[in-house]
Amino acid sequence: MMSHQQVQMDLILMQGIWTSVLKMQNHSTLLQLGSSSSMPQRPRLLSRVSQRGRLTLNLESGRWRLSIIIFLETGTTQLVTTILPSTDYLGI
């Protein structure tokens, strides 16, 4: 579990979907991150950045890069997902 003064985060696998559980002062939010079939490794926290009323949690799982942006005043969230290109060579 990752903890910030105003936000706690836990990652769970719910029905084959990696899900972030965000616990804020007055409520909790579930945020679906991706299918465990396409993201087989549990996402791990790379960094957290707090600035001007928002907290950004940067996670990775294999080629997946995820940024969860939490607007602290309103408790709303935004998920930005990037999948890095494969480095495998396919000889055709």
Swiss-Prot record:
Domain of life: Viruses
Record key words, sorted: Eukaryotic host gene expression shutoff by virus, Eukaryotic host transcription shutoff by virus, Host gene expression shutoff by virus, Host-virus interaction, Inhibition of eukaryotic host transcription initiation by virus
Pfam families: Bunya_NS-S
GO biological process: positive regulation of protein phosphorylation; symbiont-mediated suppression of host gene expression; viral process
Stored InterPro entries: Bunya_NSs
Family: Belongs to the orthobunyavirus NS-S protein family.
Function of the protein: Inhibits host transcriptional machinery, by producing modifications to the phosphorylation state of the C-terminal domain (CTD) of RNA polymerase II. Inhibits phosphorylation at serine 2 in the heptapeptide repeat (YSPTSPS) of the CTD of RNA polymerase II, suggesting that the elongation step of transcription and/or 3'-end processing is prevented. Inhibition of host transcription machinery leads to shut off of host cell protein synthesis and inhibition of the host innate immune response. NSs also seems to be involved in the nuclear relocalization of host PABP1.
Protein name: Non-structural protein NS-S
Annotated source species: Bunyavirus La Crosse
Gene: N
